[in-house]
Amino acid sequence: MIDLTAAPFSLDDDGIAWVRTTLAEMGEDEKLGQLFCLITYTSDPEYLGYLTRGLHVGGVMLRTMTAADAAATVTTLQSTATVPLLISANLEGGASQTVQEATHVGSNMALAATGSTDHVRRAATVIGREARALGINWAFTPVVDIDLNFRNPITNTRTFGADAATVAAMGAEYVEAIQAQGLAASAKHFPGDGVDERDQHLLASVNTMSVEEWDDSFGVVYRAAIAAGVKTVMVGHIMLPAYSRALRPGVADRDILPGVVAEELLNDLLRDRLGFNGLVVSDSTTMAGLASVLPRSQAVPRVIAAGCDMFLFTKNLDEDFGYMRAGIRDGVITPERLDEAVTRILALKASLGLHRGTNLPAQGAAGVLADPDHSATAREVAASSITLVKEEPGVLPITRERYPRVLVYDLQNGGSPIGQGARAGAVEQFVDALVEAGHDVTRFEPGGGWEGMAAPTTDVTERHDLVLYLANLSTRSNQTVVRIEWAEPMGANVPAYVHSVPTVFVSFENPYHLFDVPRVRTLINTYGSSPVVLETLLAALQGKAPFAGSSPVDAFCGQWDTHL
């Protein structure tokens, strides 16, 4: 029996009565629909009405759109739903991932680089305030993974770094601050990403920690989030073999499954050992991390049967609903388990006050998004986070008088259709700022010529006063590495002039580029590329502001030569 009076629901008598009455009035189809949190890219009323009246979905996740479209979408959904919806969004770095006009406050790693939980609290408050004004009530944040493996292609700047105590403290601060704004937070990605160098989007990855190691790291992190009152936990397609073996003695290797379908991790570890009473949601079920371990027909109902309360996204809407219905019919999901999951979904809604009608966008949402205090917070985070990792004496500052002629090497990857990846145009924006500051900027273009036919080195050493690398390479789904791919021929754009021309390397995203450019003597990490970050970076390079951040990870990647 779920204790609805206990944290994180903490319901009063009216809330409990609403949960019990609503559950009792539901038929099987309504209960089935509540299990699903679907994605919406559109504000089309007909489609949205189908989600609420036809499928009875429990929630949706908004993808990138304008503030007006987001408000219209939420209004349509909530006004047509019999049971109010959970409106979720990926709020990593800010509501700007979902709403174009919102403030990008800064990545988790930028917040960690400030060394201040006060910055975390203020950032989460801004994010929550903007999201709630738009009718968003469920934040798919914070990421509380620990970035222990610099080769991991998906955690990176999304995390609070590599120190478990820091991640625990900042994750808990984030949870308290954003939930104080009326949203449910979601600590992710249980049982913990950042250990494997592979991406759970593309396979079932492995957290290789022993039971003791996990307890002393991720265990500390999740206990802190739970103590802070986190309402939901998102479970990834990540295996934790040591704990699966400890909790299921004799389990065969082939039967060790990722967290999202591992009953021993969801119930024995998360519920019983860690004491989590809130809602458990799967990570996206469209990921190969789930598809690679079970056929879809089995995987869909197993997610709920194993202990997740909500099923995130579908591969094929009709097919997945059919698989879930079959799982209920065939007893894979028992009536008791179905009611337990739906009860937690309804309890989460009641804990947010949705049963009282506090679920529509605010009339003054545009004013909230334009609040100058929010942009001021973003500036303070940027000013406190940009990190001078490595410095060659005498190279900085960069001024027009010292370096009139600058050769820029830009290293970039693109964004994805769903808004992930590096911010397009960041390098161009920074180059424009250099030109405006009076520098004569040349952007490197690879030329022809193999051995014996390349341009003379004096073309660089005598024509340029500074070499500046601008790397805008970020983590994104479906990418197995976040490394530099050099140009032909023969690495035409590698740092070949570090002994001849002052060279500065700036990474807008990935903090681990020293692994590929160990001989670069001056390197700066910014952990983001928003206009505010670029403006702050330029001021620091010019000597007008300090480099105030401290690296939350080993930017030297454990290598001796990166210190040269």
Curated annotation (Swiss-Prot):
General remark: Catalyzes hydrolysis by a double-displacement mechanism via a covalent glycosyl-enzyme intermediate, involving the participation of a catalytic nucleophilic group in the enzyme active site.
GO MF terms, alphabetically ordered: beta-glucosidase activity; beta-N-acetylhexosaminidase activity
Pfam families per record: Glyco_hydro_3
Function summary: Catalyzes the cleavage of beta-N-acetyl-D-glucosaminides and beta-D-glucosides. Might be involved in the degradation of glucuronic acid-containing glycosaminoglycans such as hyaluronic acid.
Catalytic center residues: D283 (nucleophile)
GO biological process: peptidoglycan turnover; polysaccharide catabolic process
Name used for this protein in its record: Beta-N-acetylglucosaminidase/beta-glucosidase
PROSITE patterns: GLYCOSYL_HYDROL_F3
Organism field: Cellulomonas fimi
Activity-pH behavior: Optimum pH is 7.3 with 4'-nitrophenyl beta-D-glucopyranoside as substrate. Precipitates below pH 6 and stable from pH 6.8 to 8.4.
Keyword presence, Transcription: no
Taxonomic placement: Bacteria, Bacillati, Actinomycetota, Actinomycetes, Micrococcales
Family note: Belongs to the glycosyl hydrolase 3 family.
UniProt keyword annotations, A-Z: Carbohydrate metabolism, Glycosidase, Hydrolase, Polysaccharide degradation
EC number: 3.2.1.21, 3.2.1.52
Reaction(s) catalysed (UniProt annotation): Hydrolysis of terminal non-reducing N-acetyl-D-hexosamine residues in N-acetyl-beta-D-hexosaminides; Hydrolysis of terminal, non-reducing beta-D-glucosyl residues with release of beta-D-glucose
Gene3D superfamilies in the record: Glycoside hydrolase family 3 C-terminal domain (3.40.50.1700), Glycoside hydrolase, family 3, N-terminal domain (3.20.20.300)
